[in-house]
Amino acid sequence: MNCSESQRLRTLLSRLLLELHHRGNASGLGAGPRPSMGMGVVPDPFVGREVTSAKGDDAYLYILLIMIFYACLAGGLILAYTRSRKLVEAKDEPSQACAEHEWAPGGALTADAEAAAGSQAEGRRQLASEGLPALAQGAERV
């Protein structure tokens, strides 16, 4: 093999290495003696400068997407837990929840409340006119 063919072989291998780096298939081939040859940085033998690959440029977007996903997941879990606690507390005090619902304006007991108020006022008038019976002097107090 003469010297000219070895140069062609070296050029062919350099191009192949560059293509593999751009496609992301060369996992360990990029580690060289220079510290600037990390992930996403490929030496370009034809231009003499480093070219960044598309794989390294999109890494921060992927990390950001995962962080947003987990933030939404945590927020949803917190919201679901808060709602479930409110439901449990509402079940513990059914009388208060029922009273708030029934005594709302225009509720079911509005007509009943008006009728009861009328009968209470009538009963007070009768008691006031007749007077209360006097308690016996010797009655025991409870």
UniProtKB/Swiss-Prot annotation:
Q: What is the effect of changing residue 65 to F?
A: Found in patients with atrial fibrillation; uncertain significance; loss of its inhibitory effects on KCNQ1
Highest rank taxon of the organism? Eukaryota
| Annotated tissue distribution | Highly expressed in heart, skeletal muscle, brain, spinal cord and placenta.
In residue numbers, the region (Disordered) covers 119-142
Functional summary from the UniProt entry:
Potassium channel ancillary subunit that is essential for generation of some native K(+) currents by virtue of formation of heteromeric ion channel complex with voltage-gated potassium (Kv) channel pore-forming alpha subunits. Functions as an inhibitory beta-subunit of the repolarizing cardiac potassium ion channel KCNQ1.
Positions on the Cytoplasmic side per record topology = 82-142
Under the cellular component aspect of Gene Ontology, which terms does the record hold?
plasma membrane; voltage-gated potassium channel complex
In alphabetical order, the GO MF annotations are:
potassium channel regulator activity; transmembrane transporter binding; voltage-gated potassium channel activity
Task: Report the membrane topology from the UniProt record.
Answer: Single-pass type I membrane protein
Name of this protein: Potassium voltage-gated channel subfamily E regulatory beta subunit 5
Keyword list, A-Z: Alport syndrome, Deafness, Elliptocytosis, Glycoprotein, Hereditary hemolytic anemia, Intellectual disability, Membrane, Transmembrane, Transmembrane helix
* Assembly and interaction partners: Interacts with KCNQ1; impairs KCNQ1 localization in lipid rafts and only conducts current upon strong and continued depolarization.
Q: What is the lineage of its organism?
A: Eukaryota, Metazoa, Chordata, Craniata, Vertebrata
Bilayer-crossing regions: 61-81
Family label:
Belongs to the potassium channel KCNE family.
Annotated consequence of substituting residue 81 to H: Found in patients with ventricular fibrillation; uncertain significance; loss of its inhibitory effects on KCNQ1
Q: Which gene encodes it?
A: KCNE5
Q: Where is the signal peptide?
A: none
Which residues are tagged as glycosylated in the record?
A: 2, 25
Disease annotation reads:
AMME complex: An X-linked contiguous gene deletion syndrome characterized by glomerulonephritis, sensorineural hearing loss, intellectual disability, midface hypoplasia and elliptocytosis.
